[in-house]
Amino acid sequence: MPDFITIAIPKGRILQDSVALFKKIGIDCEELLSDTRKLVFENQEQKMRYMIVRATDVPTYVEYGCADLGIVGKDTLMEAEKDLYEPLDLKFGYCRLMVAEPVELSSKDDPSAWNNIRIATKYPNVTEKYFAAKGIQVELIKLYGSIELAPLVGLSERIVDLVSTGETLKQNGLAEIETIAEITCRLIVNRASMKTKHERISKIIEGLEQHI
């Protein structure tokens, strides 16, 4: 429906924070928080549509125009490298993309001497670029969850993963070594939609900007 604005949002805490933020600018989408298996919601009165998708898929839905807008972590954008407009840092969902290793290794390790190291991560593209810029060769193992397990069972020496409080790392005997990036959620926009629906999208962007 060309007169609708479609927004792709992932489940979880990002969804809750997004709904709260939209409410501040008069966009009512609290239905998204209901206990349902629905993936698409429509508000006919406000001409808004919402898609609930995996966080890693948000940039793809926006890039291909299935969604006009999306809300997603900067980590996902860095890894995906899609051709998108990124007008706003929404200032929520803060965490850090970190290099970590076992505590016993960190006590005697010298990161400046690293070379040919094996790293497990959900972010192979970001990780490879980070270490290439430092002139360090790495062997990357892509995992999709429980990254902290990799050093414990000998799959990798180190990991690159998102860290919020650091408690999960500590419980698994891992220490933070280097910060690759500080991460927050971003508003992203399909480039064609920004032109064809410029007035409505600009109004949303301006409204959000006043509340972050």
Swiss-Prot record:
Subcellular location, principal: cytoplasm
Protein's UniProt name: ATP phosphoribosyltransferase
Annotated EC: 2.4.2.17
Reaction catalysis annotation: 1-(5-phospho-beta-D-ribosyl)-ATP + diphosphate = 5-phospho-alpha-D-ribose 1-diphosphate + ATP
Record keyword Kinase present: no
Similarity remark: Belongs to the ATP phosphoribosyltransferase family. Short subfamily.
An example molecular function term from Gene Ontology annotations: ATP binding
Keyword annotations: Amino-acid biosynthesis, ATP-binding, Cytoplasm, Glycosyltransferase, Histidine biosynthesis, Nucleotide-binding, Transferase
Example of a GO cellular component annotation carried by this entry: cytoplasm
Role played: Catalyzes the condensation of ATP and 5-phosphoribose 1-diphosphate to form N'-(5'-phosphoribosyl)-ATP (PR-ATP). Has a crucial role in the pathway because the rate of histidine biosynthesis seems to be controlled primarily by regulation of HisG enzymatic activity.
CDD domains associated with the record: PBP2_HisGs
Domain notes: Lacks the C-terminal regulatory region which is replaced by HisZ.
One record GO biological process: L-histidine biosynthetic process
Highest taxon above the source species: Bacteria
Subunit description: Heteromultimer composed of HisG and HisZ subunits.
Pathway stated in the Swiss-Prot or TrEMBL entry: Amino-acid biosynthesis; L-histidine biosynthesis; L-histidine from 5-phospho-alpha-D-ribose 1-diphosphate: step 1/9
